[in-house]
A protein has these predicted regions:
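An N-terminal assembly and electron-transfer interface module characteristic of large anaerobic redox
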Residues: 1-269
Length: 269
């Protein structure tokens, strides 16, 4: 938000460096305009590459990562590895403006990066000459949310979803195998004239109505034994049927391993 940023900069520079407020506002506006222009340049370059792909009949990979993945010390040359196989590489922010996310999503979409990522995936699923590879580093718990959602957007429409888990170790062996496997799968699909059907990724929630209050039981996940043992009788006092699910047994662990992303940490849930 340019207004909030400008106010913060005026307060900081006026107090610490005695710089006139008008000068700070002018500089902040110029910087903000440059930021917006850089984004427009990125989008224009993305459209340019997409046009080139159509003209040449080539394929492209949207390499989706967090902002720190532009650092060569973190991505370990994966973009160059992909281009060595004859694919063009695009970032998610170069194509996200072309995609429209069908809502609501399964996840809570409240972060700008996540929204951009879902928009990029929504665009990729409509393009036959594009696929997406998502980078994941440091076991980020929030990426456990994004990887599941991006996978859902792509696979529902018949796209192959690939995530590369990379860390500080400079070893491209596993990444190379995953990328070559993706390329091989795409070639097999082309040979077999595989046809996809693009479908909506919107999630249709069942709404709990007043009529359900009498006959339906609310199932509550056990997130904290101390607190949730108090929540159950509190909600029942309002006339709801509720059962807090117990998770201190082997079957609960097995179900969790089957349906929950192994990288999901408590804050991400």
């Amino acid at each position: 938000n340019e207004e909030i940023l400008t106010k913060a900069l005026v307060a900081e520079f006026a107090n610490a460096f005695d710089i006139p407020a008008a000068e700070v506002r002018m500089a902040a506006h110029a910087g903000w305009e440059e930021l917006l222009q850089s984004r427009r340049d990125m989008e224009a370059k993305g459209e340019e590459v997409l046009d080139w792909l159509k003209q040449t009949g080539r394929r492209g990979i949207v390499l989706a990562g967090r902002p720190y993945h532009v650092d060569p010390e973190i991505h370990h040359g994966i973009p160059e590895l992909i281009t060595s196989y004859g694919f063009a590489v695009l970032t998610e922010d170069s194509v996200s403006h072309l995609g429209k996310v069908e809502r609501p999503l399964v996840v809570t979409d409240q972060w700008m990066y996540h929204s951009r990522l879902y928009a990029a995936a929504s665009f990729v699923k409509t393009q036959e000459n594009l696929d997406l590879i998502q980078l994941n580093s440091f076991g980020c718990g929030l990426d456990a949310v994004t990887t599941d959602q991006v996978s859902d957007i792509l696979t529902r429409s018949g796209k192959i979803y690939t995530v590369l888990k990379i860390d500080e170790v400079n070893n491209l062996g596993a990444a190379r195998i995953r990328i070559r496997s993706l390329i091989a799968a795409l070639r097999v699909r082309d040979q077999r004239n595989f046809e996809r059907k693009v479908v909506s990724s919107a999630y249709h929630r069942a709404v709990f109505t007043k009529e359900m209050k009498k006959d339906y039981t609310l199932l509550c996940p056990q997130m904290s034994p101390i607190h949730f043992d108090l929540i159950e009788p509190a909600i029942r006092s309002f006339g709801y049927k509720i059962e807090v699910l117990q998770n201190h047994n082997r079957s609960a662990v097995d179900v969790g391993l089957q349906y929950v992303n192994n990288d999901a940490c408590y804050p991400s849930l």
